[in-house]
Design a protein with these regions (language model features):
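Surface-exposed interaction regions that form or flank ligand-binding interfaces
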Residues: 1-116, 123-129, 140, 150-237
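Active-site ExK catalytic segment of metal-dependent nucleases
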Residues: 131-147
């Protein structure tokens, strides 16, 4: 199978940015905490009234700064953990794609100036085309009125619409040919289903069954591979 891109590359970069930011905030919180302790001790030990007041004010300000930095550090490190899980899900889908005997696959392919990249584009073994959005979760998946749930958790945004939009963009790149829109939740435990808009929702285990439904849009495997190569080379850096 011809492959381009790196599965989970975008969210991995996000993870490292969040980790770096979280580490800086954590270091700032530690520095502010030490400053606060020193200033408050000074307020207790100093003899001059004005100096004691100044030290106390500085200590309170440093303590407030410590609290703010700690909150930001916790938030950034939480975002880093979520990005790490998202990258892992995209790699799970890549593994599933490699088992489907597909002709070509691209990971993180940018299909337009808006809407971000498509997690995975696949040209199937039947010479069909699919745009896959990857979401994270384990349990029963349901979708209704623009909301998708995995177990009791509501996924952010509208994953089915995201997949449909990416499929539409890919279709335009392919001259209006039909593209299957898919949301893949690797840990989904129920059977594949379609939303009211015709977007397929499936687990990594059932991905091949769903991809086999993509109608043929290429005359031969070599045409599909060359098309993927051209799409990747033409995509914005």
């Amino acid at each position: 199978m011809y492959e381009v891109g790196r599965a989970g590359d975008f969210v991995s970069r996000q993870m490292w940015r969040h980790r770096a930011r979280g580490s800086l905030y954590a270091a700032g919180a530690a520095t502010a905490a030490l400053t606060a302790v020193g200033a408050l001790l000074g307020a207790l030990l100093l003899d001059g009234g004005a100096l004691r007041v100044s030290a106390a004010v500085a200590g309170v300000a440093a303590a407030a700064g410590c609290g703010y930095a700690w909150i930001r550090a916790t938030r950034s490190l939480g975002q880093a953990r979520r990005s790490s899980v998202g990258a892992r899900s995209e790699r799970e889908v890549r593994t599933a794609v490699r088992r489907t005997e597909s002709v070509a696959a691209a990971y993180g392919l940018v299909l337009g100036s808006r809407g971000g990249d498509c997690d995975t584009v696949v040209f199937t073994r039947g010479c069909g085309a699919a745009a896959i959005e990857v979401k994270t979760g384990h349990g029963r998946v349901s979708a209704e009125n623009g909301t998708m749930r995995v177990g009791n958790r509501v996924l952010h945004g509208d994953p089915a619409r995201q997949a449909a939009n990416q499929a539409r963009r890919l279709s335009r790149k392919l001259g209006g040919r039909t593209v299957l829109a898919v949301v893949c939740v690797p840990g989904m435990r129920n059977r594949p289903f379609t939303t009211a808009a015709g977007v397929w929702v499936c687990s990594a285990r059932d991905l091949q069954t769903v991809l086999d439904r993509a109608p043929r849009v290429f005359g031969a495997a070599e045409e599909a591979r060359e098309t993927m190569r051209s799409l990747w080379q033409a995509a914005p850096a």
